[in-house]
Design a protein with these regions (language model features):
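Extracytoplasmic/secretory-pathway segments with low complexity and glycosylation-like composition
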Residues: 2-12, 22-195
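C-terminal effector/interaction modules appended to NTPase cores
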Residues: 14-17
Length: 195
């Protein structure tokens, strides 16, 4: 009998890891049951010279095939500028983590422009907006909320099938053309379990 080689040991370890992940995916029924967390951050300077360190965190970024609820936390945002938090198609040309490529409005988004299905929020201190959709910033430009996500953004626009999708922040309708607050956390959906 010959001793196992490093290559054989690595193959075995990879097989065990892959099997463990395959066993976990069907159990990820809710965001809280999944260990996958996404992060985005960038530092921005406004025309007034103020600097903001934007941080965005989402739990979970791997959802069941039918969708699920994701907990989202933001901090460091400019309280003088409202933002939209939504689930959108990642525009062509955007390279995640490279804000110099964030030149196009993220669209389409789940729920459309006037979403009331829990798939989007407007965060603002202006005090106007749709109850349950519009929420105020907390101290330090923070916000904590949930998003209810599903893979079909619109007819024929399906995440992980026809497009790539992400939880995004962007300036609200008071500054739609500004890309200063754009951030992306990609989200994926586990394949439907056959059997």
């Amino acid at each position: 009998m010959t001793p196992p080689t490093t290559t054989n040991l690595l193959r075995g370890a990879f097989a065990v890891t892959a099997a463990a992940l395959a066993a976990l995916l069907p159990l990820a029924g809710t965001a809280s049951a999944s260990p996958f967390t996404g992060h985005a951050h960038r530092t921005v300077t406004t025309a007034d010279g103020e600097t903001f360190h934007l941080r965005l965190t989402a739990e979970s970024t791997l959802l069941p095939a039918a969708g699920g609820t994701v907990d989202v936390l933001g901090k460091g945002y400019n309280r003088a500028q409202g933002i939209f938090l939504a689930f959108c198609v990642i525009p062509d040309g955007v390279r995640l983590g490279d804000p110099s490529t964030y030149t196009t409005l993220p669209t389409p988004c789940l729920g459309g422009r006037e979403s009331t299905d829990g798939s989007a929020r407007r965060i603002t201190d202006q005090g106007t907006g749709t109850p349950g959709v519009t929420i105020p910033y907390e101290k330090g430009g923070r916000f904590t909320t949930t998003l209810d996500l599903e893979p079909e953004i619109a007819d024929g626009v399906v995440c992980d099938t026809t497009v790539k999708c992400a939880i995004v922040t962007r300036a609200d309708f008071t500054a739609t053309s500004s890309r200063l607050y754009d951030q992306y956390i990609p989200v994926h959906f586990a394949p439907a379990h056959k059997g």
